[in-house]
Every structure is written in structure tokens, then in C-alpha cells.
Curated annotation (Swiss-Prot):
A cellular component term, taken from the record's GO annotations: plasma membrane
Pfam families to which the protein is assigned, alphabetical: DUF1328
Protein's name according to its UniProt entry: UPF0391 membrane protein Tbd_2239
Protein source organism: Thiobacillus denitrificans (strain ATCC 25259 / T1)
Keywords: Cell membrane, Membrane, Transmembrane, Transmembrane helix
Family: Belongs to the UPF0391 family.
Transmembrane segments: 4-24, 33-53
Predominant place of localization: membrane
Disulfide cross-links: none
InterPro entries in the cross-refs: DUF1328 (IPR009760)
Subcellular location field: Cell membrane
Protein's membrane topology: Multi-pass membrane protein
Domain of life: Bacteria
Length: 57
């Protein structure tokens, strides 16, 4: 349990560093792009999965 507390402490220090240095705006833009890519892939695989189940039956 202490290990996880230290891991999250280090993550919070890194996030604080990025938040106070102005790098966060660039990282947020990249995160938005990655989010939309992940949503598109999720929907694609969801549709493919539905059609795969229908073709098996």
C-alpha cells in the first residue's frame, strides 16, 4: 500500500511541475487528440464485434 502511495505522490509531483510550467496546454491538446482517436477505435471495434457475432450465428 505504501508503494502505491509513493507512486501517486511522484505522479502528482510530475503533474504539478507540468501544470505550473505551462507545458500543460500542449499536453492537453495531445490528450484531446488521443482521446478522440481512442473513442473512434472503440466505436470501430464495437461495430466490428457486432457484425462478427452476427456472422457466427
Amino acid at each position: 500500500m505504501l508503494k502505491w502511495a509513493l507512486v501517486f505522490f511522484v505522479i502528482s509531483l510530475i503533474a504539478g511541475f507540468f501544470g505550473f510550467t505551462g507545458v500543460a496546454s500542449g499536453a492537453a491538446a495531445i490528450a484531446k487528440i488521443l482521446f478522440y482517436i481512442a473513442v473512434a477505435l472503440f466505436l470501430l471495434f464495437l461495430v466490428l464485434g457486432v457484425f462478427a457475432v452476427k456472422s457466427i450465428k
